[in-house]
A protein has these predicted regions:
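Enriched for short, Lys/Arg-rich terminal
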Residues: 27, 68, 72-81
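Basic, Lys/Arg-enriched alpha-helical interface segments
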Residues: 1-67
Length: 81
């Protein structure tokens, strides 16, 4: 089975850090924040195998460009294979 290299953009990392900070600081749930951060990171890393398993987005021109969406709990991960 083919494996892909997964590269996380600086913007995506910043978004993940902001999610963590909001849950940890605003909601005062640091353990929940770490769990959410880890679930998102694990889901992103899982794209190294079968990244086509998630659907293309419906909007254009993003669909034509190959943009896909993966849901992780209440969050969306957008990526291109």
């Amino acid at each position: 089975m083919k494996q892909y290299d997964v590269k996380i953009s600086h913007v995506a990392l910043r978004d993940m850090e902001q999610i963590y900070s909001y849950i940890a600081d605003c909601l005062m749930e640091p353990d929940t924040a770490m769990g959410q951060y880890n679930r998102i990171a694990k889901a992103i890393q899982s794209l190294n195998i079968l990244p086509e398993r998630c659907a293309l987005v419906e909007s254009e021109p993003e669909r034509t460009q190959g943009l896909r969406q993966m849901l992780v709990d209440n969050y969306s991960v957008f990526y291109i294979v």
